Swiss-Prot record:
Keyword Transit peptide found: no
Pathway linked to the protein: Purine metabolism; AMP biosynthesis via salvage pathway; AMP from adenine: step 1/1
Predominant cellular place of this UniProt entry's protein: cytoplasm
GO cellular component: cytoplasm
Organism in which the protein naturally occurs: Ureaplasma parvum serovar 3 (strain ATCC 700970)
Protein name: Adenine phosphoribosyltransferase
Entry function: Catalyzes a salvage reaction resulting in the formation of AMP, that is energically less costly than de novo synthesis.
Assembly description: Homodimer.
UniProt keyword terms in alphabetical order: Cytoplasm, Glycosyltransferase, Purine salvage, Transferase
Amino acid sequence: MINIDYIKSKIRDVPDFPKKGIVFKDITPLFLEPKIIEKIVDDFADFAKSLNIDAIIGAESRGFLFAAPLSIKLNKPFILVRKPNKLPNDVYSAEYTLEYGSSRVEMHKDALKPNQRVLIVDDLLATGGTVAAIENLVRQAKGIVAGSVYLIRLGFLKGEEKLSGKVHALINY
């Protein structure tokens, strides 16, 4: 039986990556066991069902790893949010800061219709900067953020305080 403790045991801490002072949570070992991913997606689906969503937004790149199978499981559209200059059509754009730098995210303008309710999926919630920027994209498209879901939440960074909608994480540190 796969439980939270088992999943946590497979996540590696990598000190000083991508820069000094950061402890990176390496989730790649989880993907060596498909049943772990199935358990994570099932948990995310249970949360999503309570939100009455119309679409799922995945954050590049590790958010895609969970958003794609979740969209298939729930039969909901999957909207990709990518780093700058990776989408070929007209985009909404939003700036943000990370735990270890700053960047921008983009979403196709025709991906989300006004008043659609979305669930944002990412692997990790740290400072909340990435997802706050994605929420900005949703507002630009006149959509509604129903919530966001993560494999890992670093609670000590209080990222959820920057976010709207319900927040759920399978693992909390």
